[in-house]
Amino acid sequence: MHRRNFLSLIAGFAVSPAAIAKSNARKQCLLLIELQGGNDGLNTVIPFADKAYSTLRPTLAIKNDKLWKLDEKTALHPSLHKLNDCWQADQLAIVQGLGYENPNRSHFRSHDIWTSASEFDQRKDSGWLADTLPEENSTVQAVIYGNRSSVLQGGELNYISMHRTREFLSAKLPKLQALESNANNSQRHVHSVLKNTLAYQQRLRAVAKSLEAKGPDDGGEFGNNLFAKQLQDAALLISSGLAPSVITLHLKGFDTHANQIERQGKLLENLSTALAAFRAQLIQNGHWDDTLVVTWSEFGRRAGENASGGTDHGTAAPQFVLGGRVKGGLHGQQPSLSELQNDDLVHTVDFRQLYASLAEQWWTLADSSINKKRYPALDLVKSA
């Protein structure tokens, strides 16, 4: 086999030999969902009582009679209505106004800042999770659905990546098995990587059997789209006792420069439908208290709409935190619509405060890469 073919097969594996012996003991799992492209926070968590909202957005403002109102001032986009049970159970936290000083409107640079937890004028080669999570030779610490996640780059974390669990088990592993059987002594490193990778497959057999029992791969109650199916796979992974410390997913399409009403509405509907099914399944299987779901996006959108029925790259935006141990409700302060800076919202909560909360309250880490004096944790998670 050509070297490039081999590399394409093993891409995404970094599993230590000791990972194979890890038991199926339950553990806490953080599920990170990237709303890729920059979600418009102002039409997600809506300050409908502020008259400036409809003034800034004469055609994009969600009509009052369609809003899912949380209180007398704040509402959610109607497409998020399937999260109502989670909200009513006080298991949905909405962190308002997340951003950082001297915001950058470039997708690439702002993405780097969010994934590395760096300052606006600082360059880092490692992701904030790679810097935060302690190394464990005895476990697979992360599962990545889709492209490699920058929050995990650098360091020595053990991870495995896949597009879909079913596809991974049916297509990629047979090729790896054939390659492993043909490896010779001169390919000792290759043989070692393959052996460890294939051994991890044994722990996925329960997942494979469950997938086969489900029949057609249509996503079911999660929804018939790639994100929904990947979230369904993640739920099955957690329910099967294979939860790593971190699972990452991406929901693409939030760069809504035009036709935003329809595009964002569909994306938020896909998000809420899949998350509602995910929560229901984990509650049924007794793993909801062990799971924390957090959304993030590289930036929000401009306060005002553009001439194309959309919004351009902006700054601050809200994010969601869901789980059985979450302290639900509104956290932080909605950015002012009357005190804009260069036509942008001014952030009220630094996004690294969210990361500090995860390190302190979810993983109970006394030390992490986050400067907790500058970025104090929010009160988001109940103790176990």
Label every PLM stretch briefly.
Residues 2-285, 304, 318-384:
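Feature for exported/extracytoplasmic and membrane-associated proteins, marking the mature portion
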Residues 300-304, 309-318:
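A post-motif C-terminal structural segment
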Residues 292-299:
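Acidic/histidine-rich, metal-coordinating catalytic segments
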Residues 288:
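Conserved H-loop
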